[in-house]
Amino acid sequence: MAGRELSHLQQLEAESIQIIREVAAEFDNPVMLYSIGKDSSVMLHLARKAFYPGKIPFPLLHVDTGWKFKEMIAFRDTQAKKFGFELLTHINPEGLAQGINPFDHGSAKHTDIMKTQGLKQALNQYGFDAAFGGARRDEEKSRAKERVYSFRDRHHRWDPKNQRPELWRTYNGAVNKGESIRVFPLSNWTELDIWQYIYQENIELVPLYFAAKRKVVERGGQLIMADDERMQLAEGEQIKEEVVRFRTLGCYPLTAAMHSEADSLEKIIEEMLLTRSSERQGRLIDSDQSASMEQKKRQGYF
């Protein structure tokens, strides 16, 4: 009797769960990076499925910058309490003491100190030898050429010219002391796959993904949400209310909203079917300079 044929989403789910289970079995001290966005929410859901009815056998790590949307932090804490996973948070103490922020120091310096260096500090502090990330190959060109198991040296650096072959979904997780692997279970998913899976599995998300009236400032052709009193206005700028949503989430001064009426999963999926713009066009850190994402990854960014 022929076996039941899996749907496209079921195939992706099975592949991701297999990767998560393999890493948990193969590595001594894995961790799942939790950025609180839609991809992290899907990855968390897959990890819960992978080990159900038991608990996730590794912690989740959120590298905080001090500039995430308030709704993101509230959602993070609610999810940890609801599902009972171990949540670790880290913020770069040196950057915090220096008052590093995206307004006064710029996106490149802020991202390097508070995200890249903060991540490396946390990985070193806890001695993690494998770190799950929610990146997908369709997001950005440097991620398109990265392996599922992405080898990092003792300094957490990625060398795109020195990647290990992955034939027939066979992954090489051999590392020496101090080295590590970044693991991307969602590598073969697309943005549309993510949204359709969220709809299918009824996965909770930060409300910022759904259209609503929000206070924003138009800056450089982008809509930046005034999330708290630290928002700095340039001369002539005014805060106004617009119906917007976010396609991607990060530090609020570096993440642009988009005009949208999509206030439900069905409407977001319909919008995704029609869009021709890049998912990361709202991430201001990607426009620092040419090939900036690859340079960040070479330095240790996830």
Curated annotation (Swiss-Prot):
GO BP term, example: sulfate assimilation
Task of the protein: With CysN forms the ATP sulfurylase (ATPS) that catalyzes the adenylation of sulfate producing adenosine 5'-phosphosulfate (APS) and diphosphate, the first enzymatic step in sulfur assimilation pathway. APS synthesis involves the formation of a high-energy phosphoric-sulfuric acid anhydride bond driven by GTP hydrolysis by CysN coupled to ATP hydrolysis by CysD.
Sequence segments annotated as region (Disordered): 280-302
GO molecular function terms attached to this record: ATP binding; sulfate adenylyltransferase (ATP) activity
Gene that produces this protein: cysD
Keywords associated with the record: ATP-binding, Nucleotide-binding, Nucleotidyltransferase, Transferase
Protein name listed in UniProt: Sulfate adenylyltransferase subunit 2
Pathway(s) served: Sulfur metabolism; hydrogen sulfide biosynthesis; sulfite from sulfate: step 1/3
Keyword NADP: no
Top EC class, one word: transferase
Family: Belongs to the PAPS reductase family. CysD subfamily.
Catalytic reaction(s) noted: sulfate + ATP + H(+) = adenosine 5'-phosphosulfate + diphosphate
Nucleotidyltransferase keyword on record: yes
Organism, as annotated: Shewanella sp. (strain W3-18-1)
The protein's assembly and partners: Heterodimer composed of CysD, the smaller subunit, and CysN.
Annotated EC: 2.7.7.4
